């Protein structure tokens, strides 16, 4: 399996270190020598991120970066031992539920560093799709339910969701690009919830589908222009926020009319499942489960 890599902005967010500081540390003290992508971007590995975290910890404790850089050989030895130990103790790793409970407790306490640490542990222990299916997606559902019930605040919900989003984006950067079929993915025009869309993009990438991800709040007219230019094999839409049948039908009709006739259109999310009859009437497929992934991938 290819080693996961991150662009510098993602590595900075994962490590809690400013991009400018990473560049300065590299230039002045040679703390890292990241590989370069064919496009010339720095590509940081999980080990690089771990080194940055250790350097941040030392400097936060008052150690000068010049002195911390001298400790890199010992830091690297410790990281190698940690990786080896992790491989030898995979059977003893926490269950997905334990990870989720740890992150929920950290969210309740506004402990974002703890959320970050557990997320890193999850992604180091599990393959990307397994991590999403067993930990990240259920975690987001739990967080959403607790926000709706009033046991989590908006600030707490944002605290964890932005961390999960950063990890999903990093997994997408590292995922295979896909070669045969091409899908364009977008949220409904007023839809701000994009985690499900990111998860769909990740799975389709791993199924060999080339994905163009347009993200949140995509106007129907703009989606139509993009699709005309890209000529994909299908369009995937996501809609989570609750809406009336009339509003849902009006929005989906505008989206359908903006797209070429005959182009397969799929829609997923809680709102879509609530209005399946509308989708059927407009000849739009409602995503239901595992078999539909194979249909989208053409397998």
Swiss-Prot record:
Changing residue 193 to A: Lack of activity. Decreases oligomerization. Keywords: Carotenoid biosynthesis, DNA-binding, Repressor, Transcription, Transcription regulation. It holds the Pfam family MerR_1. Residues 5-74 form the HTH merR-type domain. Requires cobalamin (vitamin B12) for repressor activity. In the dark, binding of cobalamin to CarH induces its oligomerization, which enhances binding to the DNA and repressor activity. Light causes cobalamin photolysis and disruption of the cobalamin-CarH complex, which decreases interaction with DNA and allows transcription of the carB operon. Interaction with CarS also prevents binding to DNA. GO terms for biological process: carotenoid biosynthetic process. Residues 180-299 form the B12-binding domain. Negative regulator of the carB operon in the dark. Binds specifically to the CarA operator, in the region around the carB promoter, which blocks access to the RNA polymerase. The N-terminal region interacts with DNA and CarS, and the C-terminal region is involved in oligomerization and binding of cobalamin. Belongs to the CarA/CarH B12-binding photoregulator family. This is HTH-type transcriptional repressor CarH. It comes from Myxococcus xanthus.
